[in-house]
């Protein structure tokens, strides 16, 4: 049966409208997909180091950037909850806490803090986080200013704990500084998680400088040192304990460095090794290198701040403070302040790490005191690692 002409025309118009609607749906879907892809992926950065290696300073280099949410050593809460445990037994708990914080899930701290109302000042060293001292966490200080920790502590300590999570979610980069990992294996699940886009900045320092700094702040590090020694503490003479701790630290830094080279190239490209001494000699250039690695713009006011903070007169003896200091003198201080006997013993404990990372041994007190003798070798990173 033939359809009337009006019916044919109506069907034709309906079909054309359906095609047009489908076209607009597909077009809008593609535009939506493109805009979603155009949004920058959130970057998660782990500054991985050890105590007294300049990591607080490196943390501040990231933390003062207006695009960064930064926390300093959140795993401190895990270790202080389980003081009788060992570093290796706590690796998984530390890793799980780090993952949660990267995802801005601050309920993870419930297991490590007293129940009841909390403030953001309940977090260890919270005042070192510019993000917790500016909006949306604390509206008093402008977001794009360099914020001294003393001002932060004075003005923002009463903010409720809930603002930590809110602040975390408002930044493109989440940076955590941690000194409580002793191998890379425990971090594999985070490295392989595509949703995290994890980048590791591995900061190392001359073990002799680390040892000298640890001696001057040993009271602050007593609990951490006991956890590192674990069951070995009772077997070691008191005078041997600092060297054992340094041996463990050196071995762990060495293993982390070597392990990264066995990973697939895609993972190796998310690892950056930085020597503190290189940073001390060329702070602006090395900071630029780290910023570029994680996709941050090196803003002019930050360049000025980095220059000034590394040209002060302080020697950086406090365990957790970052203030103006002469970075080059700090990196060399062990050469005139440590007895050669201690240096010689330390070189035996950390020799492999020193050799691989480019720290030359001294063979006499005369070599140690001769500041014209450069003990930092010109060191090329293997091709597959930045």
From Swiss-Prot:
Annotated TM spans: 8-28
Lumenal membrane side: 29-386
Highest taxon listed in the record's lineage: Eukaryota
GO biological process: carbohydrate metabolic process; cell adhesion; cell-cell signaling; immune response; inflammatory response; N-acetylglucosamine metabolic process; O-glycan processing; positive regulation of leukocyte tethering or rolling
Pathway note: Protein modification; carbohydrate sulfation
Binding site for 3'-phosphoadenylyl sulfate: 51-57, 205-213
EC number: 2.8.2.-
Catalyzed reaction equations: 3-O-{N-acetyl-beta-D-glucosaminyl-(1->3)-beta-D-galactosyl-(1->3)-N-acetyl-alpha-D-galactosaminyl}-L-threonyl-[protein] + 3'-phosphoadenylyl sulfate = 3-O-{6-O-sulfo-N-acetyl-beta-D-glucosaminyl-(1->3)-beta-D-galactosyl-(1->3)-N-acetyl-alpha-D-galactosaminyl}-L-threonyl-[protein] + adenosine 3',5'-bisphosphate + H(+); 3-O-{N-acetyl-beta-D-glucosaminyl-(1->3)-beta-D-galactosyl-(1->3)-N-acetyl-alpha-D-galactosaminyl}-L-seryl-[protein] + 3'-phosphoadenylyl sulfate = 3-O-{6-O-sulfo-N-acetyl-beta-D-glucosaminyl-(1->3)-beta-D-galactosyl-(1->3)-N-acetyl-alpha-D-galactosaminyl}-L-seryl-[protein] + adenosine 3',5'-bisphosphate + H(+); a 3-O-{beta-D-galactosyl-(1->3)-[N-acetyl-beta-D-glucosaminyl-(1->6)]-N-acetyl-alpha-D-galactosaminyl}-L-threonyl-[protein] + 3'-phosphoadenylyl sulfate = 3-O-{beta-D-galactosyl-(1->3)-[6-O-sulfo-N-acetyl-beta-D-glucosaminyl-(1->6)]-N-acetyl-alpha-D-galactosaminyl}-L-threonyl-[protein] + adenosine 3',5'-bisphosphate + H(+); 3-O-{beta-D-galactosyl-(1->3)-[N-acetyl-beta-D-glucosaminyl-(1->6)]-N-acetyl-alpha-D-galactosaminyl}-L-seryl-[protein] + 3'-phosphoadenylyl sulfate = 3-O-{beta-D-galactosyl-(1->3)-[6-O-sulfo-N-acetyl-beta-D-glucosaminyl-(1->6)]-N-acetyl-alpha-D-galactosaminyl}-L-seryl-[protein] + adenosine 3',5'-bisphosphate + H(+)
Membrane topology (Cytoplasmic): 1-7
GO cellular component: Golgi membrane; trans-Golgi network
Pfam family, one: Sulfotransfer_1
Annotated Gene3D superfamilies: P-loop containing nucleotide triphosphate hydrolases (3.40.50.300)
Keywords, in A-Z order: Carbohydrate metabolism, Glycoprotein, Golgi apparatus, Inflammatory response, Membrane, Signal-anchor, Transferase, Transmembrane, Transmembrane helix
GO MF entries: N-acetylglucosamine 6-O-sulfotransferase activity; sulfotransferase activity
InterPro entries, per the entry: Carbohydrate_sulfotransferase, Gal/GlcNAc/GalNAc_ST, P-loop_NTPase, Sulfotransferase_dom
Induction (UniProt): Upon cytokine activation, it is expressed at low level.
Tissue: Specifically expressed in HEV. Weakly expressed in spleen. Not expressed in other tissues. Expressed in colonic mucinous adenocarcinoma.
Compartment(s): Golgi apparatus membrane
Record text on subunit structure and interactions: Monomer.
Protein family membership: Belongs to the sulfotransferase 1 family. Gal/GlcNAc/GalNAc subfamily.
Function: Sulfotransferase involved in SELL/L-selectin ligand biosynthesis pathway. Contributes to generate sialyl 6-sulfo Lewis X determinant (also known as MECA-79 epitope) for SELL recognition, a prerequisite for continuous lymphocyte homing into peripheral lymph nodes and antigen immune surveillance.
Additional remark text: May serve as an anti-inflammatory target.
Protein name stated in the entry: Carbohydrate sulfotransferase 4
Organism annotation: Homo sapiens (Human)
Classification of source organism: Eukaryota, Metazoa, Chordata, Craniata, Vertebrata
Gene for this chain: CHST4
């Amino acid at each position: 049966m033939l359809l009337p002409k009006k019916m044919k025309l109506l069907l034709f118009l309906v079909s054309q409208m359906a095609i047009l609607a489908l076209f607009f749906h597909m077009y809008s879907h593609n535009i939506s997909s493109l805009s979603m892809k155009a949004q920058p992926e959130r970057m998660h950065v782990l500054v991985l180091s050890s105590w007294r290696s300049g990591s607080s300073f490196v943390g501040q280099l990231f933390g003062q950037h207006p695009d960064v949410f930064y926390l300093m050593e959140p795993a401190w809460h895990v270790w202080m909850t389980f003081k009788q445990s060992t570093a290796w037994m706590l690796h998984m708990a530390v890793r799980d806490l780090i993952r949660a914080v990267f995802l801005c899930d601050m309920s993870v701290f419930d297991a490590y803090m007293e129940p009841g109302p909390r403030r953001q000042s309940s977090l260890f060293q919270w005042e070192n986080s510019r993000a917790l001292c500016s909006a949306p966490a604390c509206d008093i200080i402008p977001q794009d200013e360099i914020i001294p920790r003393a001002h932060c502590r004075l003005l923002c300590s009463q903010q409720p704990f809930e603002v930590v999570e809110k602040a975390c979610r408002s930044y493109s980069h989440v940076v955590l500084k941690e000194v409580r990992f002793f191998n890379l294996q425990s971090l594999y699940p985070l490295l392989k998680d595509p949703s995290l886009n994890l980048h590791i900045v591995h900061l190392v320092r001359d073990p002799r400088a680390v040892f000298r700094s640890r001696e001057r702040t040993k009271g602050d590090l007593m609990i951490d040192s006991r956890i590192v020694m674990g069951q070995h503490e009772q077997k070691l003479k008191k005078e041997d304990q600092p060297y054992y701790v340094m041996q463990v630290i050196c071995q762990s830094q060495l293993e982390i460095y070597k392990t990264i080279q066995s990973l697939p190239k895609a993972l190796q490209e998310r690892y950056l090794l930085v020597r503190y001494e290189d940073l001390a000699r060329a702070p602006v250039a090395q900071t630029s290198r780290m910023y570029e690695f994680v996709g941050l713009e090196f803003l002019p006011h930050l360049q000025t701040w980095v220059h000034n903070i590394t040209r002060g007169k302080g020697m950086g003896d406090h365990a957790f403070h970052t203030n103006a200091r002469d970075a080059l003198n700090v990196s060399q201080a062990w050469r005139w302040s440590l007895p050669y006997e201690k240096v010689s013993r330390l070189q035996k404990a950390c020799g492999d790490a020193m050799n691989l990372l480019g720290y030359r041994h001294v063979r006499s007190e005369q070599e140690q005191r001769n500041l014209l003798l450069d003990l930092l070798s010109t060191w090329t990173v293997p091709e597959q690692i930045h």
